[in-house]
Amino acid sequence: MTNSTHFGFTTVSETEKARKVAEVFHSVAARYNLMNDLMSMGLHRLWKRFAIDVSGAKPGDKVLDIAGGTADLTRLFLEKTGSTGEVWLTDINNSMLSIGRDRMLNDGKSVPVAQCDAEKLPFPDNYFDRVCVAFGLRNMTHKDAALREMWRVLSPGGSLIVLEFSKVWKPLQPLYDTYSFKALPFMGKIVARDDTSYRYLAESIRMHPSQEELKQLMQQAGFERVEYFNLTAGVVALHRGYKF
């Protein structure tokens, strides 16, 4: 019997969710960066810079960028780790990963790339100093399993950074809902010729755990000293936890 889960507001089988999420990112990959700039009015660049700073990445670190897609975080981590570091770009979606890899090569930078499932990471225990997942955990079916895998591959003293859409400050909720369910699909239709994927984005944000719930999930996976930072009134939250 196949277990059920949610794809946005719709209940589907786990197999169907994996297929539908893959279809979303195959569809939006080509215009992904442009849509990020439009949807966030460029704020996503500041959120990602903040994530890098909070990660504590330093020269020589081994870093795993999960759901790294178009390599925004990978590029920023390289600035911190330098020539003695090792930054892996990974994603479950080949369309996204190909764009990220090509962007790196166009910049004259080569990093190891792997297409893999965050719930079954192909890396040894205690290997990475930093693990980061930005705007990817929301789409994972078994978030608890993925977080346990992130804990497994971190070396003692290492940190996990989770950057993700979260629960907005309540007084802003009506305005945010209007923007999410009206403006985002409209922009998706005009720019990416795909309103359905951006409707899923709005729905998936509502189904994602709250700031406190995600903190608890990270603690249950083994992370310690877990804390979070609300960015842009909680539109996005950055969680950080350590492995000791």
From Swiss-Prot:
InterPro entries: SAM-dependent_MTases_sf, UbiE/COQ5_MeTrFase, UbiE/COQ5_MeTrFase_CS. The keyword Iron does not apply. S-adenosyl-L-methionine binds at residues 70, 91, 117-118. GO terms for biological process: aerobic respiration; menaquinone biosynthetic process; methylation. It is an enzyme of class 2 (transferase). GO terms for molecular function: 2-methoxy-6-polyprenyl-1,4-benzoquinol methyltransferase activity; demethylmenaquinone methyltransferase activity. Disulfide bonds: none annotated. Pathway: Quinol/quinone metabolism; menaquinone biosynthesis; menaquinol from 1,4-dihydroxy-2-naphthoate: step 2/2; Cofactor biosynthesis; ubiquinone biosynthesis. Keywords: Menaquinone biosynthesis, Methyltransferase, S-adenosyl-L-methionine, Transferase, Ubiquinone biosynthesis. SUPFAM superfamilies: S-adenosyl-L-methionine-dependent methyltransferases. PROSITE patterns: SAM_MT_UBIE, UBIE_1. Its EC number is 2.1.1.163, 2.1.1.201. It catalyses: a 2-demethylmenaquinol + S-adenosyl-L-methionine = a menaquinol + S-adenosyl-L-homocysteine + H(+); a 2-methoxy-6-(all-trans-polyprenyl)benzene-1,4-diol + S-adenosyl-L-methionine = a 5-methoxy-2-methyl-3-(all-trans-polyprenyl)benzene-1,4-diol + S-adenosyl-L-homocysteine + H(+). Belongs to the class I-like SAM-binding methyltransferase superfamily. MenG/UbiE family. HAMAP family: MenG_UbiE_methyltr (MF_01813). NCBIfam families: MenG_MenH_UbiE, PRK00216.1-1. Methyltransferase required for the conversion of demethylmenaquinol (DMKH2) to menaquinol (MKH2) and the conversion of 2-polyprenyl-6-methoxy-1,4-benzoquinol (DDMQH2) to 2-polyprenyl-3-methyl-6-methoxy-1,4-benzoquinol (DMQH2). This is Ubiquinone/menaquinone biosynthesis C-methyltransferase UbiE. It comes from Nitrosomonas europaea (strain ATCC 19718 / CIP 103999 / KCTC 2705 / NBRC 14298). The gene is ubiE.
